[in-house]
Amino acid sequence: METQAKLRFSRVSPQKARLVADQIRGLPVDDALRTLEYSPRKAAEIVRKVLESAVANAEHNDGADVDELRVARIFVDEGPTMKRIQPRAKGRANRILKRTSHITVAVAED
């Protein structure tokens, strides 16, 4: 049985979040949490919280054994982009894109 958790509109670039997601795809949950705990990336903390939520969902909703869970699927989709303006010299302006992500983590028993 596959159980999932989603985080939408997270303020992290999808490109950076995918680097973290690729590291834990297919790993047992214990190994994945350990990997995320020692990763220096901002996205690692965000993905760790989503993974912990998916594990809690599996335990509470499906009665799954936490020790048998693994990361079945994890993917990061692009959310809406906030457009901001940064003033420059001589009356000009540059556009700043603040990107968001939708992170989905699915865990399943072996």
UniProtKB/Swiss-Prot annotation:
The keyword Protease does not apply. Keywords: Ribonucleoprotein, Ribosomal protein, RNA-binding, rRNA-binding. GO terms for cellular component: cytosolic large ribosomal subunit. One of its GO terms (biological process) is translation. Gene3D superfamilies: Ribosomal protein L22/L17. InterPro entries: Ribosomal_uL22, Ribosomal_uL22_bac/chlpt-type, Ribosomal_uL22_bac/org-type, Ribosomal_uL22_CS, Ribosomal_uL22_sf. Signal peptide: none annotated. PROSITE patterns: RIBOSOMAL_L22. It holds the Pfam family Ribosomal_L22. GO terms for molecular function: rRNA binding; structural constituent of ribosome. NCBIfam families: rplV_bact. Part of the 50S ribosomal subunit. Belongs to the universal ribosomal protein uL22 family. HAMAP family: Ribosomal_uL22_B. This protein binds specifically to 23S rRNA; its binding is stimulated by other ribosomal proteins, e.g. L4, L17, and L20. It is important during the early stages of 50S assembly. It makes multiple contacts with different domains of the 23S rRNA in the assembled 50S subunit and ribosome. The globular domain of the protein is located near the polypeptide exit tunnel on the outside of the subunit, while an extended beta-hairpin is found that lines the wall of the exit tunnel in the center of the 70S ribosome. This is Large ribosomal subunit protein uL22. The lineage of its organism: Bacteria, Pseudomonadati, Pseudomonadota, Gammaproteobacteria, Chromatiales.
